[in-house]
Structures are given as C-alpha cells and as structure tokens.
Amino acid sequence: VDAGLIIHESRFTYQRTGLVSVIDLGDWWEQTTGHAIPLGAILARRDLDDTAAQHVNDAIRASLALARRDEAKIIGYVREHAFEMEDDVMRKHIGLYVNEFSDDLGDVGVAAIDDLFARAHAAGYIPENKPEFVPES
C-alpha cells in the first residue's frame, strides 16, 4: 500500500494532487478520546525557576498578540517557511493551529495533554510522568 502522512498546509490542498484521505488523525483523536488534539508544546526544564518560565510564557503571548494585530508583518515570514504559497491556504493553516489554546490551554487543553501522556505511558513509550504547566501571571 502506498501511503503517507499529510501535515501542515498540505491538509488543505492534498486533493489537488489526486491524493485521498484514508483517515484524518486529528478527527480520529478527537472522536477516540473526546479531547482536543495536542499538536505541540513549548517546554521548559523543570529546574527553570517560575519567574524565568513566566517570562518565556509572557513573551510568547506577546508575540502571538502582535501577530494577530498586524498579520501583514508576519505573512512574509510565513511565506518563506510555508509548503503552500497561497495566502488563503496559509491563513487557514494559521487559523487552525494558532488558536485559543495557543494563549491559554484551559481545562480542555490540560485534559488533552494529560490524556496523551497517560496513553503514551500505557503503551510503554514514556515513563509515568505528569506535565507541569507554567503558572499564570
């Protein structure tokens, strides 16, 4: 069977090349677990003090806020690193992955990450581990 994993902006354009979706892993995760899909994370070492971790967290939030206020300032950078060059595809990609969870995981996001860790541990991929989150400022 010829198969592949479609990621990033290509999830919006793969049909143009004649590819067919067998399963959308995001949909599968949400239907199987009942949780949002935890797509990525920004991590800090546990020995980093809370103040330093909070500074990083605040800087990321400020960056996201700036990007939302003036999309024109970031579109050139995004275009340089995008797999698909069409503006509408890039905007869909950003809108899908830079969302309310980017600013604040909330209980929904924390539950998704906790479930991911529990499943990874149960499958033998990681030792038992509970993620810690940077306290809100």
Describe the role of every protein-language-model region.
Residues 1-80:
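Pocket-lining segment of extracytoplasmic ligand-binding domains
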Residues 30-38, 113-124:
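Short secondary-structure transition/capping segments
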Residues 44, 50, 103, 128, ...:
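Generic structural "secondary-structure junction" signal
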Residues 49-119:
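Secondary-structure end/capping motifs
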Residues 118-137:
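Conserved C-terminal helix/tail region of periplasmic/extracytoplasmic solute-binding proteins
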